[in-house]
Amino acid sequence: MSGRLTGILPIYAKLAWWGLVSPPARAGGPLVVYHGVILSERGVLLSVRSDLRGWELPGGNAEPGEPGEAALRREILEETGLEVAVERRVGDYVRTGFAAHTARVYRCRPLRGELRPSSETPLVRWFPPSDLPDTLFPWYRAPLADALAKLPEPVTRHEHWGIAAISSGMRIDLRMRFSNDRAGS
């Protein structure tokens, strides 16, 4: 077990550096990350990243000059193997404190493709919206609820990521790493 703990330290150090230093120093302005709430008759699609492990919404950053919705479709394809239609914007989740950024969340539906994990997201799985895993990072619960509520207009929510968010993320990550249940549900 000590070898597994030692392997986590570089990952946590990288995430700490990114969370404390990198986002405010971006030359292109505030960081915007794009996420998709992908819904189908199978449920909602969630993924687990290879670095900080816990269930989350697929998505990521735009390349320089890339429109947000195009970046979202590209990231979802890379991470899940699915091509999606972006139906509507759910909202902007403005996060201050650790890893300050805005998460721009869209409701999506799958068009084609086969669900497959990637090196970046080794686990991808459908979940019933009424039975989400307890290892879902808590900062994804509000965007999921907003997407499922089919609100008439996009929302803007402000969240502060302090020590509670950091410790919650670490607990989920450690549980996923050391659990025999690789899905963490």
Task: Describe the function of each predicted region.
Residues 53-54, 120-185:
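Nudix hydrolase/Nudix homology domain
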Residues 60, 74-75, 87, 127-130:
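Structural detector for helix-capping/boundary residues
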